[in-house]
Every structure is written in structure tokens, then in C-alpha cells.
Amino acid sequence: MSTTATVATTPEGIPVIILKEGSSRTYGKEALRINIAAVKAVEEALKSTYGPRGMDKMLVDSLGDITITNDGATILDKMDLQHPAAKLLVQIAKGQDEETADGTKTAVILAGELVKKAEELLYKEIHPTIIVSGFKKAEEQALKTIEEIAQKVSVNDMDILKKVAMTSLNSKAVAGAREYLADIVAKAVTQVAELRGDRWYVDLDNIQIVKKHGGSINDTQIIYGIVVDKEVVHPGMPKRVENAKIALLDASLEVEKPELDAEIRINDPTQMKKFLEEEENLLKEKVDKIAATGANVVICQKGIDEVAQHYLAKKGILAVRRAKKSDLEKLARATGGRVVSNIDELTPQDLGYAALVEERKVGEDKMVFVEGAKNPKAVSILIRGGLERVVDETERALRDALGTVADVIRDGRAVAGGGAVELEIAKRLRKYAPQIGGKEQLAIEAYASALENLVMILIENGGYDPIDLLVKLRSAHENEANKWYGINVFTGQVEDMWKLGVIEPAVVKMNAIKAATEAATLILRIDDLIAAGKKSESKGGESKSEEKKEED
């Protein structure tokens, strides 16, 4: 590695400076070795968290805030990485997390195992281009295998969808409540799913997640409607309204200030009284217009004047102010109402319906529950837990589980977990490799070994002997009928994972394989690492900041 200025010479021997002094350049095998080491280091950080028996990580940021999690995306997000190859891997992993809700750890660990196998091939003097070509062919066969063995799943297969959610939750800190939470997840996702043409569409933004610490995880509940994290604005208003007709307002119930600055000259108290009466009448008219539509609940995004609160209370209307815009949009989907920006245009047809609107105390706070719509296309999950960290980790776990169930509904396919898919792909790759022959055959076989290493990590984290169990798994997969055989990490037995209920979205597996292969091949193609030097220094080595201090 060179850290001095890079100099080239012309045919006449004239030196030409290419890189500034302070720049560094690493090239050839050394650059490849360093990049591979960086990827392996990121993989090592995640390996112990893989699978249902994986460990947690305690992450402390620069402010001293502590996060305890085994969520791959969270760990990578909070790691302060410096090496460009490591950052590249994290970017690809984040892309996996955005594309599908799970599979981040699988993508990173598989990428790490692939570059390890590539490193072994490099020591055998096999060119990186040949390795990349072999990996690409192996990836193609792996994706083809998943498409062939994946099982069809529909939105009505509630039992399978619950098992998908449970599989996702199994590896989280909330695994003790996985059955209860999986039921909530499956109900929430199927409720907001919509059939568009011949495909199912799921927008997870229509599932509101509200967190309140207190109680236990088992107090977490699904609400077929929306929870507004506000309280009723006036003590004289009803706290419970059945058969609610809801006005959703993106307009204030306050006296509007003129756009232009204006002054009103008042010469005697009667004029002041008339002015205040006129303001009051304006607000009363607004309330009367709302009441005339038949509304008995008002959810307002903006403010509600005290006078308007008084008149709303007199008419027995429950009102909430300063609701979030996102809550208003979800309420519209949940209740069938329409958000109105001008009170004068409010009609009975704009009102939403809910069987019950009620203010309830949750922990230390009061919240308004809007539930019991006829066919709500937006629902809420209220998360409870004794500690804020428990609530935060439950939220992360639920978001992953919601995403995996949504992935299965959108794609309509699922596969078994527990290493079954990886073993089946590895078996088929070993049969496919001799058909290619040459040095590429070695790369394809290395890809198969990397997939098997994923299963070995799963077994090791369960506390079992990986060599012994891998032999049993290979033997089981020789029989075509045993394609779903994997490792039960809770018993250490080789079992049919589909029958056991360990089920994952096919699209998550496919995207993890794509992301890992892309990361590994990208790293293998790099043979030159050029890093720019720090900003130039001035005045005999004094930095600009030091120079400025002297001037001050």
C-alpha cells in the first residue's frame, strides 16, 4: 500500500503526479484481501445472532444510549463502520431490508461465507472473473430451485400465515409470546390486504403501531380501527359514543386570522362586546353545520377554540384536536369517511362510521379508540411491555413479522425454514456443477458449501455438533421426498420443517440470495482501492482549524 503521491513518467522521463500526497492506494491481491477481511468482519458481528437460538447484541451509541437487539438491520444501522467494503455490504443489506422485511442477516452472513470460499479459490490461483461467473451460474440455479419447490399460499390460509409470523418471531427477544403475537400479526395483515386485478396488495402503512410501556407483552392487542394518541378536548364532552358518525376535519375550529395585517379601532366597550359576539357566532355556526350533518364525533387535525369546544360539548359531540395527518388518513380508510378541508362543504356522505369511539386510559396517558368499522382497511396494534426497551424490541419484532406475512400474501409462495432450502439448493448445485466443468465447477461447488455453512452456523448457535447433523441432513435430502427436512434447533433433531410449522416467504430467501451474491461478486471485482488524502494542510503543517484558532 502506498500513502505518498503517485507519480507516473512520460516517455521523455518527465514525472507526472497522478494522486495528491496523503492519498493511499492498495491494488491487486492485497486490495482484494483487505476487502474480503472487511466483509468477514461484518459477518462475524452478526453470526452469533442467526437463528432462533441466536444471541443478542448490546449497542451503545456516542451519547450512551443503549439498544439491546438481535435484529440484523438495527445492528448494521447502529454500527459505526469505516471501511468502504464493509459500508458497501451494509448498503446492500439495507436494500434487502427495504425490499423485504426480513433476511438481512441471511444476506450478510451468506455474503461473508461466499467471500471466504472465494478466498480459498484465489489461493488456488483461480481468477476472480471465473469465480464471479461460477457464482452467477450458481445463483441462477438456486433461484430456479426455490421457484420449483415453493408452495402456493393464499390470503385465506390463516394457519400457514400464522406459522410464517411465528417463524419470524422465533428468533426475536419476544419469542416467549410468539403464538399470541403471531395471531395478531396474521389478523392485521389479512385485514388490510386488497385484491387488485389478480394480485394481492398489502400496504403496511395502513397498520398503525402505537407503543405504551406498562403491562406485559401479552397485553398487546389489535384494534379494528385506529388509536388516536390524544384525549377528548373538553371535560363536558361524552367519553364514549356508540354508533359513531365521524367528521374528519383538516380545518381549524378557530376564528381565522386575516392574511393581511389589519387593525380594528374600538372606541367604547359595546363595540368590543359586539366584536367578541361576532367571533362567537362564527364558531357557533361552524359547530351547527357539523351537527347538522349528524356527526357525533369530530377528529380535527388543527386546533379547536375553547368557545367551539363549549358548543360541541353542549351538542354531545366528542371532539379530538391536533390529530396527526397520518392518523386522519388511516381513520378515513378505517371508517370509510372522507377528510374535509372546508367545514362549509361537509356533508353526511363524508362522515365515517365506527361502532364505538371511546377515551381510555392506557398506562399514564389517555387515548381515543375508534373501532368497530364495517370493513376497516386500516387497523392498529397497541404494544404494551414493562420496559421501554421491551416495547421497542417488540415493535421491531412485529414490524419484521408483519413484513414477512405481507411478503407471503403479495408473492403467494412460501418455503420451509430450518436450513431445508439451503440444503436442497446445495444438493442440486453439486449435481449441476460437473455439467459446467472446468474451474467454474469449483466456484459452483464453493457456492454450495457456503449455503451449507449457513446451516452449520444455525446448528452451532443451537448448541449442537454441526458436522454430525450436517451429515444427517445431507443423507435425508438424498431422498426427493425429504426436500423440507431441516434442523429443529430446539431439539437437535432432523425433521420435516413444513410439518413442524417453520415456514418462511419464498421471496425473502430469493432476495437474500440475490443480495449476498451481488455483494460477494462486487467485492471480488475490485482490484484497486484508492482513498483520497485528508484536506491539505497549510503553513508548515498547521491545519486550517489551528490557523483559525491562532487568529481568534
UniProtKB/Swiss-Prot annotation:
Pfam families: Cpn60_TCP1 (PF00118). Keywords: ATP-binding, Chaperone, Nucleotide-binding. The N-terminus is blocked. SUPFAM superfamilies: GroEL apical domain-like (SSF52029), GroEL equatorial domain-like (SSF48592), GroEL-intermediate domain like (SSF54849). One of its GO terms (molecular function) is ATP binding. InterPro entries: Chaperone_TCP-1, Chaperonin_TCP-1_CS, Cpn60/GroEL/TCP-1, GroEL-like_apical_dom_sf, GROEL-like_equatorial_sf, TCP-1-like_intermed_sf, TCP-1_chaperonin, thermosome_alpha. Signal peptide: none annotated. It comes from the Archaea. Coiled coil: none annotated. Forms a Heterooligomeric complex of two stacked nine-membered rings; one of alpha and the other of beta subunits. Belongs to the TCP-1 chaperonin family. Molecular chaperone; binds unfolded polypeptides in vitro, and has a weak ATPase activity. This is Thermosome subunit beta. It comes from Sulfurisphaera tokodaii (strain DSM 16993 / JCM 10545 / NBRC 100140 / 7).
